[in-house]
Curated annotation (Swiss-Prot):
Record protein name field: Ribonuclease H2 subunit A
Lineage of origin: Eukaryota, Metazoa, Ecdysozoa, Arthropoda, Hexapoda
Manner of cofactor binding, per the entry note: Manganese or magnesium. Binds 1 divalent metal ion per monomer in the absence of substrate. May bind a second metal ion after substrate binding.
One GO BP annotation of this record: mismatch repair
Names of the cofactor(s): Mn(2+); Mg(2+)
InterPro entries: RNase_H2_suA, RNase_HII/HIII, RNase_HII/HIII_dom, RNase_HII_hlx-loop-hlx_cap_dom, RNaseH-like_sf, RNaseH_sf
Length: 347
């Protein structure tokens, strides 16, 4: 790290410390009870209060100006590639005339920003008057459990489909909240043309642009990217293990398959019968290979694809027939016939 980079990192750390010192928000319980994320400090407690096996959606308050004036909306994700943790989709929106606010925030591709810088921008989005008056945002935390079950179910749902459904769901929730959307900018998953066609079919009245590297081209997408990335980072920091595991910070690494710390975590924290803790995406080849190498092999009988044919028993089968006088002859019970038992007395 160069001397200049070292100075920048130190400044960012100082800013984060100032956020903690100057933030006079209520305690963790109030964060969870209010359901509002009003600063960076509130993000972790909010996430910690949610069930991490289920998806969580959060929408900020909509600035009044976003209800009245035409807005641009950006969409991006964080955590698509890792084998560990959730994938987070984020949106951010502001009036078409409010580019200055995005510039003042310093919005840029979240992957090119340090963690400290992302945290500072996220905090400013939620605390600075020039931002809260015209910028809104929302995220969906898509659990590893949802990702795995979607990709493993009989009618498989690919990660691209999960991503597109989340993006469209967040756009729809912004519409329902009253945001006056005019333009939408999306960082693509898969071919941009197909994604754009799908979005236009769902939202035909919007001007929609789907592009590669949109987070480094459009500041509104950069803002969405920052919200998504900061949310994912904090989701990992406050992750609760219902399996009862005690995991130290950073013991599972970045979560990316190529990270040796992550690979070691997958090797050490594997149950030979039940597999991995809920943090892991079972559907990733890295996890599948680790299970194949270490876990017990399981065999399950394949259910018959054809439904069995049941012949209904007719009521007349229980009777032998009738006598000449028309009296019905009742069939003897199989239990007595097999044991050669018969009635010796008439009652």
């Amino acid at each position: 790290m160069s001397d200049q980079e070292d100075v920048v990192v130190k400044k960012e750390k100082k800013c984060i410390e100032n956020i903690d010192e100057n933030d006079e928000e209520p305690d963790d319980v109030d964060f969870k009870d209010s359901g509002k994320i009003s600063s960076l400090k509130a993000l972790g407690p909010f996430i910690a209060g949610k069930e991490n096996s289920r998806n969580t959606v959060y929408l900020s308050d909509v600035p009044d100006i976003c209800k009245d004036k035409p807005c641009m909306l950006g969409v991006d994700e964080a955590g698509r590639g890792p084998v560990l943790g959730p994938m987070v989709y984020g949106i951010s929106y502001c009036p078409l005339e409010s580019n200055k606010a995005l510039e003042d925030l310093g919005c840029a591709d979240s992957k090119q920003l340090t963690e400290g810088k992302r945290d500072i921008i996220f905090n400013d989005i939620n605390t600075k008057e020039y931002a809260t008056s015209c910028v809104g945002w929302a995220v969906e935390i898509i659990s590893p459990n949802t990702i795995s079950t979607s990709m493993y179910r009989r009618s498989k749902c690919s990660l691209n489909e999960v991503s597109m459904d989340s993006a469209m769901g967040l756009i729809q929730q912004a519409i329902d909240a009253g945001v006056n959307i005019a333009e939408v900018y999306v960082d693509t998953v898969g071919p941009p043309e197909k994604y754009q066609e799908k979005l236009l079919k769902r939202f035909p009245s919007f001007k929609i642009t789907v592009a590669k590297k949109a987070d480094s081209t459009y500041p509104i997408v950069s803002a969405a990217s920052i919200c998504a990335k900061v949310t994912r980072d904090h989701a990992l920091k406050v992750w609760s293990f219902p399996e009862g595991l005690v995991i130290k910070d950073n013991e599972f690494g970045s979560g990316y398959p190529g990270d040796p710390v992550t690979r070691r975590f997958l090797t050490e924290y594997i149950d030979l019968v039940f597999g991995f803790p809920r943090l892991v995406r079972f559907s990733w080849s890295t996890a599948e290979n680790a299970l194949a190498d270490k876990a017990y092999d399981m065999e399950f009988d394949e259910p018959d694809s054809e439904k069995p044919k049941y012949a209904g028993t007719k009521l007349t089968k229980f009777f032998k027939g009738t006598t000449k006088s028309g009296e019905i002859i009742r069939e003897e019970c199989r239990f007595f016939k097999q044991r050669h038992l018969e009635s010796v007395m008439e009652f």
